Amino acid sequence: MEFIPAQTYYNRRYQPRPWTQRPTIQVIRPKPRRRRPAGQLAQLISAVSRLALRTVPQKPRRTRKIKKQKQVKQEQQSTRNQKKKAPKQKQTQKKKRPGRRERMCMKIENDCIFEVKHEGKVTGYACLVGDKVMKPAHVKGTIDNADLAKLAFKRSSKYDLECAQIPVHMKSDASKFTHEKPEGYYNWHHGAVQYSGGRFTIPTGAGKPGDSGRPIFDNKGRVVAIVLGGANEGTRTALSVVTWNKDIVTKITPEGSVEWSLALPVMCLLANTTFPCSQPPCAPCCYEKKPEETLRMLEDNVMQPGYYQLLDSALACSQHRQRRNARENFNVYKVTRPYLAHCPDCGEGHSCHSPIALERIRSEATDGTLKIQVSLQIGIKTADSHDWTKLRYMDSHTPVDADRSGLFVRTSAPCTITGTMGHFILARCPKGETLTVGFVDSRRISHTCMHPFHHEPPLIGREKFHSRPQHGKELPCSTYVHTTAATTEEIEVHMPPDTPDYTLMTQQAGNVKITVDGQTVRYKCKCDGSNEGLITTDKVINNCKVDQCHTAVTNHKKWQYNSPLTPRNSEQGDRKGKIHIPFPLVNTTCRVPKARNPTVTYGKNRVTLLLYPDHPTLLSYRAMGRIPDYHEEWITSKKEISITVPAEGLEVTWGNNDPYKYWPQLSTNGTAHGHPHEIILYYYELYPTTTIAVLAAASIVVASLVGLSLGMCICARRRCITPYELTPGATIPFLLGILCCVKTAKAASYYEAATYLWNEQQPLFWLQLLIPLSAAIVVCNCLKLLPCCCKTLTFLAVMSIGARTVSAYEHATVIPNTVGVPYKTLVSRPGYSPMVLEMELQSVTLEPTLFLDYITCEYKTITPSPYVKCCGTAECKAKNLPDYNCKVFTGVYPFMWGGAYCFCDAENTQLSEAHVEKSESCKTEFASAYRAHTASVSAKLRVFYQGNNITVSAYANGDHAVTVKDAKFVIGPLSSAWSPFDNKIVVYKGEVYNMDYPPFGAGRPGQFGDIQSRTPDSKDVYANTQLILQRPAAGAIHVPYSQAPSGFKYWLKEKGASLQHTAPFGCQIATNPVRAVNCAVGNIPVSIDIPDAAFTRVTDAPSVTDMSCEVASCTHSSDFGGAAVIKYTASKKGKCAVHSLTNAVTIREPNVDVEGTAQLQIAFSTALASAEFKVQICSTQVHCSATCHPPKDHIVNYPSPHTTLGVQDISTTAMSWVQKITGGVGLVVAIAALILIIVLCVSFSRH
C-alpha cells in the first residue's frame, strides 16, 4: 500500500512558476491575485479599442510582391549565403509548435514533475502524485530539488518504483491520480498515448531514453500511469508503465521492454587516467593508426563494463557518421587473424598443423543445428574487408584468401551449411560418429580436419520425423539465430605467440644469416656467449651454426583466439581481449507433424485404437484416478490397440496431437426391465463380481430351501405310510396314496376314504379338508408381506438421501471437486420460498510455494592456451574458478608448424589450466530445482444466483470470501490435503518432474546437479565434473584432460515422462507459475451467507397445487437423458425454483416460470435404472417414478453430470422377479412344513 498515493484535492494555480524553494505560507501575499482580474479587464478593453480603430492596409498584393522581389535580389546577390541559409530553413521547418495535448501536459508538468540528475545530466523524472513523490527505481541520480532530495524513499523492485511522502508545503503542486482507464487516448509530454487492450502505445520515435518517470494524464489532468520504458513493435511502441487498478498497484511490462533512463557514461582507464569509454584519448585513439598500443589499451580494460564501447570506438576511426550495415558486424575481425593449430586427423589418418583446425562443436540447439568453431575466418578477406564469398586462412605467417564455395562439412553424409561468419559455421547434419570440416584453397588443394563426434538430431515432440511439415503444430525449441550482429556471447582472444620458423636461417660458411622478409623476428643463438634480440632487417651471426640458433616470427598487431592448441604468449601472460561472436542460441518454435487421427471403436469399458503412423510415433495413456497406471509405446507400423477405460476416465496421447479423453457409460446388452435372463445379463455386464456373488448366494439359499422342503415331505410321507405298512391287510386310502405316491392294490374312492375317516378319525377328516384352504391362506399372507421386505431392500440399495436444508440464511454444502459437473443445493427458510443455488467448478488450481535451490545446465570446459616455459619451470597460481585445475608438466618438447617451440631440449615445462563455466546455452536450456512447500488452492466457480450466471475466483482456504451480487461465498478448505508435487521438483521447459535432486554444493560428477548456479545469469557457479588434466603428448601443443560427461544431458535422456502425463486424478500440470489444474480429488465445502432481501416470502411467491409427474423417457448414465412432464396449477404468474430432493437425480433447470394450469418439461440425469425421486417446485413436492434404460454409447468424451452413489441399483422389474421367486420358494417351504406339522400332530395323537 506504500505505492498507492492518497487522493487529496488542492486548488492549482494556473500560471506556472519556476521551481525554487517555497517560502512559508505567511509570506505569500494575496493582493496581486485580487488585482489580477482588474488588470486583465483593462488590457481587454484596450485591445478591443485598438482592434476597432485599426484600418485595413491598402494594396496588400503590392506589398507582398515587394517582399518577394527583395528575397529574389538577396538570392541573386550571394550564393554562399543561400547555401548557409538552406539548412537554417530546414531547422526552422523541423521546429513545430507543440500541440494541444503537449501544451496541456507541459502546463501540468511545470508543477508536478522534477528532473533527476546525475553529474549534471538529466537521467529521468520524479512525479508528485497524490500525497507521494514517485521515481522509477532504475533512474540513477538525485531529484533536482533541495526538499525532495532529502527524502527517504521506499523502494519496490517488483514495481521498479521508489516513493516518499511529499513535504507539506508542496502538496498543492501534486497531481491527482485515478484508476479509471477507459480505452481511448491520453496525454503525455510527447503527445497522445493510446490505451487499448490493457496496453499503452505511442508512435515509434515519440519516446526515448530519458523519459522514464514522466506521467500520463487523462483529459482532466489526473495521472493514470507513470512511464518506465518501452518496447519497439514496429510502427508503434508499447510503453512499460506503473498504473493503478482500484486498490492495487500494477506494472505493465510488454515483452522486450527497455528502461528509458538516460544511460550514464561508462569510464575506462589508461595510464591511471579515466576517460569515457566511448571517447578514447587520441594516443592511442584508433586501431588503424597505432594497432599495438590500441590492443594494449583494450587488454587493460577488458574487465570494464564499457569494454565493448571502447572496442567500437577504437575501430571506428572516422569521425563522420556512417550508415550502419552488415559490414560493421565484421569490423571487429580486423583486429584478429586466423591461425594454424594441431588437428588429430587431417584426412589421411595422421595429425598435422591444419589451417582449419576444429576448436569446438556445439550441439545445444534442439532443432539439430550444429555450431562449429574452426581456426580460419569466413566472410573476411586478407585486407580486413568484408566479403561473403571469401574466407581467409593462415598459410605460413601470412593470411591467404580462398573461395567460400570450397567449404564443406560432413558426418556420415554431407551436411548443409546454413550460416557462416568469422570462426563459426552453422550446419545441419545427418547422424554420425565423426565430423569433418574442410575447404579447397586457391591452389585447389583440399585441407580437412576430422574429430570423433557422436551426432544424433534431438527429438522434438513425440514423433521421429525427418523433414519439417507444411502443416502441423508449433512446439517450443531452440536454435542458433542467423544474425551476424553483436550478441551477448563472446570468445577470448590474446596476442599470438612467437611462431618458430627455421627456414629463416641459412648457413653461410661459418656464419648464420637470418632473412626476415619484412617481418619482426626474435632470435637466440648459443655461440660465443649469449646472442639474442629482436630484428626487422636481415642479420648475420658470425662463427655460429644453424643448430645453435632459434628464430621465431613475432606479430603483436593482431589478436588470435585463445586456443588450447596453440601456446600462450610468454611475454603477455594472462593478458587478453574479448570479441562478440555471431549466431546466439535463442528460444523459438519448431513446426512438428501431427499424426493421423486414429480410428476409434468403442466397446464395453474399452476403447480400440487403429493407428496409422507415418513414422515412429509415441502412444501414451494414463488413468485419471488415484493410480494413473501410465504406459507408453513407440508405434512404428499399423497397429490395433485395445485399452480398458476405468470409471474415472482415460487420457490417451497419440503423437503430437492433443490428448483424447474418454469416460465409460453404464451401457449393457441386457435390460433391467426384462425377463430374468436379461436382468442377469444387465447386472453381470455392469457389476460382474457382485452379480456372480448374489446369484451364487441366492442359488445356495434356494437350493437349501428346496432341499429342506423335500426333506420335510419325505419325513411326512414316511410318517403317513408306516402304520399301513405295519398293519397286515391294511388298505391305504386313495387320497393318501396319491399325495404320498404309494402303490395300492386297490384304490379306495374319495367317498370311501372320507367315510372311513369320519367313522374312525374325525379330526383327521377335518384337517385333510382344511389343507387346501390353509395353503391358500398362507400364500396370500406371504404375498402380502413380501412388499414390506422388498421396500426395505430397495431402501438399502438405492440410499436416496434428500438435499440438506437449513432454517437460516447461512447455508453450508459440499460440492465434489469435479470440473464441469453442475451441483445444486436447496436453501429452505421458514416463511420463504425455497431457493436453488447452482454451482459449477470452472477450474481448480493448486499452486505450491516454491523455493529455488539452483539451476543446472550443460557446462563448457575452458582450457586456455597452455603456458610453455622454455628452459625453465612454470608455477601454478590459485584461482577462484569453478572446478579449477592446474598442473605443470616437465620435460616437454613442443613443436609448432615451423619447428620446435623452445630452444632447450629437456628443461621446458608446460602449465596447463582448465576450469568449468556455464555453457552459452544455459540462458535458454536449463532445469530449475525447487523445494515445494504448502500449496494454496484457488477455484473458479460459476454460480447461478437470482437468475444470473456469475463467475467468481476465490482461494479455497475457508477464509477468503467473495461476493456474488449481495451474497458472500467462502470456499474450502479441501477435504483432502493432497498434492501431485513432492517436496523436491525439477522444472524444465514447461514440464515438471518429481525428483530427489542433490542439494546445493553437493553435486556428483555425471549426474543431475554437477554444475549449479542460483539463476541463469548469476556469476556464482558450483561445479563437480571430475576434471583431471593429463600429460600432453610428445611434440604436440594441447591440453588433454579427462572429465565426466554432462549430468544435465544425461538427465535429459533418462528423465522419463513428466507429471503432465503421469499425475493422478487427471491433473493438468502447468508452469509460470508451477501449478496443478483440475485435479479431481476430494470435495470442496462451500459456506454461503445470503441476505434476507434475496429470499421471496411465501405470500409473494406463487402457490403450486395439483401436481403430477410423468416420465416420458429416461436413459440412465447419460447427459440429461431423462425427460419428465409435470402438470400443475399455479395460483398466479411467477417464477419457481426447481430442485430434486434425491441426490441420485440432477435436474438441469434451476427455475421455471409458472402460470395458471399448465405443464412443464424438465430434463434430469441419473445413474439409476429405476429412479424414484421427488421434485420440489416452489414449496410443493411431487413424486416421479422413472424406468430407465441403459445408454447406447459405451464411451463418451465428457464426465457424467450425475452423482454416483457407489452402490448398485436394483430395478423394480428385478425386484418383482425376486419377489416372485422368493414367494414361490417360500410357498413350497410353507406347504412342506404344514404337511409335516399335520402328519406329526396326527401321529402323536394316535400314540
Curated annotation (Swiss-Prot):
Lipidation (S-palmitoyl cysteine): 720, 740-741, 1241
Membrane topology, Cytoplasmic segments: 713-747, 784-787, 1245-1247
Transmembrane segments: 692-712, 763-783, 788-808, 1224-1244
Signal peptide (residue range): none
Site (Involved in dimerization of the capsid protein): 186, 219
Region Interaction with the capsid protein, residue ranges: 715-719
Motif Nuclear export signal in this chain: 143-153
Any Gene Ontology biological process: proteolysis
UniProt-recorded Gene Ontology molecular function terms: RNA binding; serine-type endopeptidase activity; structural molecule activity
EC code(s) of this entry: 3.4.21.90
Enzyme class, broadest EC rank: hydrolase
Basic residues biased stretches: 59-71, 81-100
Region (Binding to the viral RNA): 83-113
Region feature Ribosome-binding, mapped onto this chain: 98-112
Segments in the Extracellular topological domain: 325-691, 748-762, 809-1223
Protein name as it appears in the record: Structural polyprotein
The species this protein was found in: O'nyong-nyong virus (strain Igbo Ora)
